[in-house]
């Protein structure tokens, strides 16, 4: 056994390769795709994520025949080179709109939100769902389009720009079904012979219910969502608390009911549909939810992931061990271990350059981040990113570049071998931890269920007494401040 372990460590398997986000961000040619893929392979990079990215010319429109000419070439060549491919489900992010096509086909599928107003006057497309008397006034609750967008792949489609594609209503199962039809089914029709062999997964990226750049003062909502909220114990008075009184114990309880309703609806409408589609087509559902602490949604992923971005985790200012983002490594690895899933990953290094110079990122920096992930049990690495092109403005889009244009590319095989060795070692080893610190949302639901079943340990019985949940919230808030 030890000899096999030693052999696997010294000669790590290609299975554990880094799988970089490959930014397709310029005019593409088959010759250049081939050149870069051969360069990846030479440095021990045996897979990649095809990631259409800002800078892709309009002549190569997303999911057009021209676009698929290059996708087919890259996937076929990957098969010949014994490389693996992960498809990316959007252009560019967050996921769920098919570059705005979902909303173009049905405007009713645009992202929606809820706002509170003291005026009985609707904005365009809004529906009045409740009127609540509180604090001597009548408050009106309007459901309507959030105005949210995604970052697109062509210039003029970034945040705040006129061409930014509309985001879709991810809590509407019909909108998500259309997203799957437009995106996943199209990829399958074009590449079905590679599904389950060369193509190992599809990456969904931080789905955002409201979309980016949405109207201020809104919370996530969708059609018939009020019924979901009521099923979780919410009521019309709670609507006021969601906007105006979030800090009191009453407001916190309303917030918990709302979060549970969002979680159940989003799980059913978005994550479960995608997971079922991927399972039926022989590929892994991978990627990550919007927040670093969204451990519940990870149950739907074949390969649950999180992402290190913007130096939210970093060596300085105790960012490695404090705050919500410091939980992400254990969030993905413990989710996988708890549910018997062999791999879990991280999309890492995005916008993690030096604070004084976002382009500066050394191999030492890379190793710090890798070790931070490995010690927490992460065993699949998605480097962000290998840029197809750095021409003109492209080098300014979410640096640093950590691939063949980087200063350390000559020695990248060292990083590849290190990643393979550590990911291989972590994948089939057994975690010996005997104590779990449960996240706030999951813990609360488990406590409630144990109370209902009469199985609550004596030490926690106080939460069932008067003001018990207030003490529970005080306890979990202390955990929050510690980064658990």
Describe the role of every protein-language-model region:
Residues 51-177, 181, 192-193:
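Acidic/aromatic-lined carbohydrate-recognition and catalytic surfaces
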Residues 8, 12-19, 29-35, 47-48, ...:
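Carbohydrate-binding surfaces of carbohydrate-active enzymes
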């Amino acid at each position: 056994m030890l000899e096999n372990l030693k052999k696997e460590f010294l000669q790590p398997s290609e299975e554990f390769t880094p799988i970089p986000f490959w930014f397709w961000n310029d005019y593409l040619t088959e010759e250049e795709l081939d050149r870069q893929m051969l360069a990846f392979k030479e440095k021990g990079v045996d897979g990649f994520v095809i990631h259409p990215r800002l800078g892709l010319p309009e002549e190569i429109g997303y999911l057009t025949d021209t676009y698929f000419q290059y996708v087919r070439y890259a996937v076929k060549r990957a098969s010949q080179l014994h490389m693996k491919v992960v498809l990316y489900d959007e252009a560019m992010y967050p996921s769920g709109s098919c570059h705005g096509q979902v909303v173009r086909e049905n405007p009713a599928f645009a992202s929606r939100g809820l706002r509170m107003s003291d005026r009985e006057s609707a904005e365009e497309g809004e529906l009045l769902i409740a009127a609540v008397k509180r604090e001597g006034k009548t408050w009106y609750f309007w459901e309507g389009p959030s105005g949210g967008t995604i970052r697109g792949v062509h210039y003029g489609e970034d945040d705040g720009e006129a061409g930014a594609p509309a985001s879709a209503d991810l809590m509407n199962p019909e909108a998500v079904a259309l997203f799957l039809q437009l995106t996943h089914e199209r990829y399958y029709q074009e590449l079905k012979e590679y599904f389950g062999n060369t193509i190992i997964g599809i990456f969904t990226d931080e789905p955002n219910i409201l979309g980016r750049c949405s109207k201020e003062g809104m919370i996530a909502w969708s059609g018939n969502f009020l019924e979901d909220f009521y099923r979780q114990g919410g009521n019309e008075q709670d609507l006021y608390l969601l906007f105006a009184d979030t800090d009191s114990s009453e407001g916190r309880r309303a917030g918990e009911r709302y979060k549970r309703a969002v979680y159940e609806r989003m799980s059913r409408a978005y994550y479960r549909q995608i997971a079922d589609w991927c399972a039926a087509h022989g590929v892994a559902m991978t990627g990550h939810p919007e927040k670093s602490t969204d451990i519940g949604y990870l149950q739907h992923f074949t390969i649950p992931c999180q992402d290190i971005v913007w130096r939210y985790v970093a060596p300085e200012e105790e960012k490695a061990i404090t705050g919500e983002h410091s939980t992400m490594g254990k969030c993905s690895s413990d989710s996988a271990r708890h549910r018997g899933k062999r791999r879990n990953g991280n999309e890492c290094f995005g916008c993690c350059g030096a604070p004084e110079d976002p382009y500066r990122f050394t191999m030492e920096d890379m190793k710090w981040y890798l070790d931070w992930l490995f010690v927490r049990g992460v065993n699949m690495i998605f480097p962000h990113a290998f840029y197809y092109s750095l021409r003109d403005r492209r080098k300014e889009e979410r640096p640093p570049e950590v691939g063949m244009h980087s200063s350390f590319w000559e020695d990248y095989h060292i990083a590849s071998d290190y990643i393979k060795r550590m990911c291989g070692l972590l994948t089939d080893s057994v975690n010996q931890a005997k104590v779990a610190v449960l996240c706030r949302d999951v813990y609360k639901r488990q406590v409630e269920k144990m109370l209902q079943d009469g199985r609550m340990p004596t030490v926690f019985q106080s939460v069932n007494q008067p003001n018990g949940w207030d003490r529970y919230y005080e306890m979990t808030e202390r955990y929050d401040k510690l980064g658990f």
